[in-house]
Each structure stands twice: as structure tokens, then as C-alpha cells.
Amino acid sequence: MKYGIVGYSGRMGQEIQKVFSEKGHELVLKVDVNGIEELDSPDVVVDFSSPEALPKTVELCKKYRAGLVLGTTALKEEHFQMLRDLSREVPVVQAYNFSIGINVLKRFLSELARVLKDWDVEIVETHHRFKKDAPSGTAILLESALGKSVPIHSLRVGGVPGDHVVVFGNIGETIEIKHRAISRTVFAIGALKAAEFLVGKDPGMYSFEEVIFGGE
């Protein structure tokens, strides 16, 4: 598979290159704030950079008829409209979190929330000091799995890749469910699965849950 990275020189960009290269995939498109290096036509473009970069990413996907794996957070309606328009021409996977564990947790939370519908629920999320958006896209994703609005507490400290704790409480007992990303590698592994999934797919919007669970 030939692939491109938007945000190539960033921390996630470097992690993505490492994981993809270990599987023998060829980096043929590099995009960062310093410019664009186009070596060949990519099958898939991976973007974990910023919302401001999305117009250029969409332009490149259309130019090369390349699928898009998008892990950028803090997206607005205008960005989702760009993705919907792009998905008429190429396959797209957009997710706020490409950790397989988080997406398994999301499915589990939906069932737990149904059973514990009368319990109090709150979410605590912790990320590195450089993360700009709060609450995190992942916390919002987990909240959506609960099926209702709940308090979300955001901490920005040190170099934490990502901790999410969902706390259910009732009189006399609590349940805490925690997911911890040990390193950014987990997100790059998820991006790889999504990229390989997109190769040969018809145009359209695909969820990361479809990548993981298929038609289940």
C-alpha cells in the first residue's frame, strides 16, 4: 500500500510512519507546515493534524482518488460537510479515537448504561499539556455511547497520551471503568487497520467500528 501523511513531522505523523513502515507500506506523500513532497500517487492519506489542514487534505485526496483516514479532533460542522462531500468520491474513515480498546469500551458502555440507567455517571479525561481541545473527542465519543449528557472533567497535565475514566455511582457502590493509552502507538496501529480496510473500498463514510467489528 502506498500512503501519505498530513502532519508528517508531528508526533503522530512520525508514529504513523514508523508503524506503517514496519508493515512494508510505502510513504509517497509528505505534508507539513513547511510544504508538500509528492513522490507517487497514494492509495490512502492519513491525517491526524489539525482542522485547519483539512481543506488541503481533501484537495489531495480528490487529486489522487485516495481514501482518507482522519483522526483530527475539534471538528466543526463545516469540516463534516467537507467529509460528506469527499465521501461521494472516495472512501473515508473518520474517528476521534483510533484505539481499538476505546472502541470496544464504547460498545460495552452502551450496554452498561442501559442496565444502570438510574445511576449517576461522570467522565474524567486526562491528556498532555499540549492538547488544545477540552473535553477530548474521545470523552465526547464515550458520552455518546451513554446515550445522555453527563459531566465531563478535563485535565491537561504533563505528557499523558490519554486516560479516560467512566464512573457509575449509586447509593452504596460505584463502578469505575478506565482506559489508558500507554503510548501514541495504539492510535497509529488503529490508523493502519483503517487504511488497509479502505484499500479497494467504494466511496462512502465508514466508521472505525466497521473497521474493527465488520458487519457485527
From Swiss-Prot:
One Gene Ontology term from the biological process aspect of the record: diaminopimelate biosynthetic process
Intracellular or extracellular location(s): Cytoplasm
Pathway named in the protein's UniProt entry: Amino-acid biosynthesis; L-lysine biosynthesis via DAP pathway; (S)-tetrahydrodipicolinate from L-aspartate: step 4/4
GO MF, one annotated term: 4-hydroxy-tetrahydrodipicolinate reductase
Keywords, alphabetical: Amino-acid biosynthesis, Cytoplasm, Diaminopimelate biosynthesis, Lysine biosynthesis, NAD, NADP, Oxidoreductase
Source organism, top-level taxon: Bacteria
Positions with a binding annotation for NAD(+): G7, Y8, S9, G10, R11, M12, G71, T72, T73, A95, Y96, N97, F98
Database matches in InterPro entries: DapB_C, DapB_N, DapB_N_CS, DHDPR_bac, NAD(P)-bd_dom_sf
Enzyme Commission no: 1.17.1.8
Active site: H127 (proton donor/acceptor), K131 (proton donor)
Enzyme class: oxidoreductase
Residues reported in the UniProt entry to bind (S)-2,3,4,5-tetrahydrodipicolinate: H128, G137, T138
Catalytic function, reaction form: (S)-2,3,4,5-tetrahydrodipicolinate + NAD(+) + H2O = (2S,4S)-4-hydroxy-2,3,4,5-tetrahydrodipicolinate + NADH + H(+); (S)-2,3,4,5-tetrahydrodipicolinate + NADP(+) + H2O = (2S,4S)-4-hydroxy-2,3,4,5-tetrahydrodipicolinate + NADPH + H(+)
A GO-annotated cellular component: cytosol
Family the UniProt entry places it in: Belongs to the DapB family.
Cited function: Catalyzes the conversion of 4-hydroxy-tetrahydrodipicolinate (HTPA) to tetrahydrodipicolinate.
UniProt-recorded name of the protein: 4-hydroxy-tetrahydrodipicolinate reductase
Annotated source species: Thermotoga petrophila (strain ATCC BAA-488 / DSM 13995 / JCM 10881 / RKU-1)
